[in-house]
Amino acid sequence: MKQPSALSALVEALRALPGVGPKSAQRMAYHLMQHDRDGAEKLGRSLLFATEHLQHCEKCNTFTEAQICEVCLDEERDPTLLCVVETPADQIMLEQTMTYRGLYFVLMGRLSPLDGIGPKEIHFDRLVRRASDGVIKEVVLATNFTNEGEATAHYLGQTLKARGLAVTRLARGVPVGGELEYVDAGTIARAMLDRRSM
């Protein structure tokens, strides 16, 4: 039996989400239609509202409902520090630590030549203009520690250093509460190389 085209379209739309395969998308679609029509309508309205009202901040490129986001407008922040992250979700995680009080630039991705993502796609020119405004003194590269994140950090670091900016990278090592026997060898090696005096 062929499913209705409206249901097929819903399944395909849900499959576009990261980590959602065909079976999960189908289960979600059937659940929404069978058991939670109100939730489905609320989800649809929320998605529509978000797509109509969210835009990119003119300064840092994160999501905002205004031209400039609250972080960029916050005069209590250190305007000489610029932290570069891959996604708005990464920015939120850093904010939750309450340890960083500078400004941000959100790349909305990372370099991945095999996927056709180059400097243009991660808004590299905008980042360089922002970092070269004469106020920024240090750029903190907080890209993820994946191969693509490392390549992105290396590329950005080389380019920004050539413009006379101080560039730092997030430290990495054993997670808080982590036991060495459960931590991978690469992480332990990095923690050993980046050790500090006490």
From Swiss-Prot:
UniProtKB keywords: DNA damage, DNA recombination, DNA repair, Metal-binding, Zinc, Zinc-finger
Zinc is among the record's keywords: yes
Residue ranges of every copy of the Toprim domain listed in the record: 80-175
Zinc finger (C4-type): 57-72
Cysteines engaged in disulfide bonds, as pairs: none
Record-given protein name: Recombination protein RecR
Function statement: May play a role in DNA repair. It seems to be involved in an RecBC-independent recombinational process of DNA repair. It may act with RecF and RecO.
Gene: recR
One GO biological process term: DNA recombination
Family membership noted in the UniProt record: Belongs to the RecR family.
SUPFAM superfamilies registered for this protein in UniProt: Recombination protein RecR
GO terms assigned for molecular function: DNA binding; zinc ion binding
Species for this entry: Paraburkholderia phytofirmans (strain DSM 17436 / LMG 22146 / PsJN) (Burkholderia phytofirmans)
The keyword tRNA-binding appears for this protein: no
